[in-house]
Amino acid sequence: MKEYQTITEVSGPLVYVETDEPIGYDEIVEIETPNGDVKRGQVLESSDGFVAIQVFEGTEGVGKDASVRFLGETLKMPVTEDLLGRVLDGSGNPIDGGPDIVPDDRVDIVGEAINPHAREYPEEFIQTGVSGIDGMNTLVRGQKLPIFSGSGLPHSDLALQIARQASVPEEEAETDDDEGSEFAVVFGAMGITAEEANEFMDDFERTGALERSVVFMNLADDPAVERTVTPRMALTTAEYLAFEKDYHVLVILTDMTNYCEALRQIGAAREEVPGRRGYPGYMYTDLAQLYERAGRIEGKEGSVTQIPILTMPGDDDTHPIPDLTGYITEGQIMMNRDLNSQGVTPPVNVLPSLSRLMDDGIGEGLTRADHGDVSDQLYAAYAEGEELRDLVNIVGREALSERDNRYLDFADRFEAEFIDQGFKTNRDIEETLDLGWELLSMFPKTELNRVDEDLIEDHYVEDVADEATAD
C-alpha cells in the first residue's frame, strides 16, 4: 500500500495527485480527510509523476491536506449465490438492512470479453409475458435487445413488468428433479429518482420477484462516478450466476442515457476533447464493453441476456446514444408516444422494432411451429392498416373498399387487443399466438398469403371469420 499527501487539485469528481512511482490504471484508492472521513476512488489516468482519481462518493470535504492510499488492486465485486433477494447501492453495498455479504469470490468488475470461438450462438426463447415482444420481436437467450423510449414514456413500468414476468418456458416445465438451469434477474438502475426507486422496490417486494433478483440502485443524487460503476457491478454479478452457478440471467439496465451523461460529465471534468454532442469519443467502445458481456459460453449451462433501456433525448433515434447502441446490439424495441397518448400499455410500436435473432429462438420445439408465419402476417396486415390510416385522412373512410376497411379494423383491434394488455397481464406464448390467430381470422383465408396452408387449416378461427363477414 502506497500513501501520499500530495494532492495538487480537486476539480468536480476528480482529484489530482503527484506520485513518485508508477500507479496502475483502474487501481482502487482510499482518500482520508483530516476529520477521518474515508472516500473510495479509482485511478482514471496515470502518467509519470501524475495521477487523476475519480471519487465515488464525491469530493466534498476533500482538500490538499487529505491522505491518498493506493491499494494495489482494481475494483472488485463480492459475488455469491446469496446475492439473490438483495438490494445494493450503485457501488455494490447492501442497502436493504440485511446482513453483510459473505462472498464466495471477489471478481474484477471490468470483466473479460468472451472468446468469440467459445461463444455459443444465442438461441432458445425467453418469455417476457408481453405480446408485443414475445410474438413480434422475440427475445432470445444470450441476446442483447435494447428498449428505446422517450422522456415521460412508461419504460420503468415495462422494465418492472419484464423483471416480474420473464421466464424460460422449458425450465417452468421441468419436473421436481431440479434438473436444468434456474432463471434469475439482475436489475441495474442508474440515475433514477427516489420516487422511482421506491416504486421499483414496492413492486419487487409485493410481487415476490425480489426472491430471484439482485437489484442495484444508483439514485439521481448519487455521484456521477458511481453511475459508471453500477452496470459493471450488475454484469459481474450476472456473469457469476450464469457461468459459475448455471443460472439463465436476464440483465435489465435502466437508464443508459443517465450512464452516458455521467461519461460526458466526467469527460468534461478531465477537459477531454468532446465528440458528437459533447459525449466522449470513446463512448462507442465503452458501451460495447457493457453490451458485449451478454451471451452464452460453450460448455456452460447458464447464459446472460441483456435488456438495456434508454430514453432518446427529444425522441431522436439519431442521437449518439441510441445510434451507437443500435450498432452494437441485436435489434431494438421502440416505445411510441402516440400509442401512449391513446392509452395503449405498454406502448410498443412493433413496426420499427426488430429482434435480429428472433428466427433462431422460435418455431417447433422452441415456441410453436406457426410462430414465424403468424408474426409475418401480423406485421404485413398492421403495416397495411397503418398506410390506410394515412389515406383515410385524405379521402375519408367512405371512399375505401370493404377490404381496406377490414384492414383498418384490424389495425385498431391489433392495438387494442394484442398490444394493449396493461402492465399487470402476463400472457404466455400460447395465449399470444392464439390471440394473433383470432385477429388474423378477420380476413378470408386467401388474404393470409404469408402463412402455410396447413397452419391455416389447423389454427384459423372460423367463428371470427363468420362474424367479420357478417359485419
UniProtKB/Swiss-Prot annotation:
Transmembrane segments: none
Cited Gene3D superfamilies: 3.40.50.12240
Primary localization: membrane
Compartment(s) where it occurs, according to its Swiss-Prot or TrEMBL record: Cell membrane
Record GO cellular component, one term: plasma membrane
GO molecular function: ATP binding; proton-transporting ATP synthase activity, rotational mechanism
Keyword Membrane: yes
Membrane topology (UniProt): Peripheral membrane protein
Role of this protein: Component of the A-type ATP synthase that produces ATP from ADP in the presence of a proton gradient across the membrane. The B chain is a regulatory subunit.
Record-linked PANTHER family: V-TYPE PROTON ATPASE SUBUNIT B
Protein name as catalogued: A-type ATP synthase subunit B
